[in-house]
Amino acid sequence: HSLNITVTNFKNTKGSLRVCITDQKNNFLKDCLFSQIVSIEDDNVSLSFENLKNGTYAVSVYHDENNNGILETSGLFGFPSEPFGFSKNPSVRFGPPSFKKSAIIVNDDKNITIKLN
């Protein structure tokens, strides 16, 4: 199956978009089953992952503005200083969402939109 992702709300076109798909709730935000690095040319970016098997997945993205491959954080609590987002666009206040809050079921071709925070 295909998972078509549109990421919105870019503030600039510096750097790149880094996308991670996982199917492991215990490794959410750590290990990517599939990943892509995409250049940013507009305030929206669209990309696709092909040949996904039926399953439950979560998608995390971040705008790597300085293109160093690391999600920059700041402050005492280490909140991301680069824009980020997750499938299902869960509320993010006191840390990243759980796998369950970001999980999507892929059993056919699917389109999702992720809004950067």
Where are these regions (language model features)?
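Extracellular Ig-like/FN3 beta-sandwich strand-entry sites
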Residues: 14, 54-56, 109
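Extracellular beta-sheet/turn segments enriched in Thr/Pro/Gly and aliphatic residues
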Residues: 82-117
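Short proline/glycine- and polar residue-rich coil/turn motifs
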Residues: 38-43, 106
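Acidic, glycine-anchored loop motifs typical of Ca2+
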Residues: 65-72
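Short, ordered, surface-exposed loop/turn motifs in non-cytosolic proteins
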Residues: 12-26
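A short tyrosine-centered beta-strand micro-motif
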Residues: 57-61
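A short, amphipathic beta-strand motif
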Residues: 3-10, 19
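A glycine-anchored, Pro-Gly-centered beta-turn/N-cap motif
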Residues: 43, 48, 53-56
